[in-house]
């Protein structure tokens, strides 16, 4: 062990005994740490205090950005001095005790940041739809564009990670397709015919011969049909079995019949019977 290292160890032990812990680092030879400096103290006044220990090479008071003193500084000597002796001594300035100790240079952690390998991205995956379509197109998923990363150098080394490859797995999915289908009809034209309402009036009546003969039964049919198109008239017979009063007013011979009451039934033998089990008396005018 050299004399300088032994002296540095003694200085560290002395500083520990003065109730403050020294920071880790390299001890600067022939340099003393001075703490407890008042803001009114200047470098010339502090240099005059240490002239008795040796020729002062440099004296520096640490200040902040605004130039205000932080309250401590360093005094270095040209010649080799006994720093331990200076630290053990009591130096007062204007009744204020200064804090002395060996000057220690902190270790600067110089670390290098290593850029990790770039991410490898596989080429774009092409998707094909699972449905069948005449205008089916393939869809291509574009790869993301990654901007170049600037390399930085930091103070601490970090282990570099291995290159990472991201593989895109094609996924086949069925998506609902929407398309328009035009209705296909046969070439023949279809005509739809709706049945038109039709009415048939049937009535039976007995007419008395004006010459005094026997009653002559007659049956008349009146067909009425309405065509939907109006061009071709089609007959539809619907047996309503209904006798109307209008059908008995006129006959094919355009003879007008007068209706009689029940009292006239005794006077006249001409009787007109309807199918609805009602008796109506009819008088024929001569």
Swiss-Prot record:
Germ-line specific; expressed in adult testis and ovary. Localized specifically to the oocyte and embryonic germ plasm and to migrating primordial germ cells (PGCs). GO terms for cellular component: cytoplasm; mitochondrial cloud; pole plasm. PROSITE patterns: DAZ, RRM. Residues 155-180 form the DAZ domain. SUPFAM superfamilies: RNA-binding domain, RBD (SSF54928). Belongs to the RRM DAZ family. This is Deleted in azoospermia-like. The lineage of its organism: Eukaryota, Metazoa, Chordata, Craniata, Vertebrata.
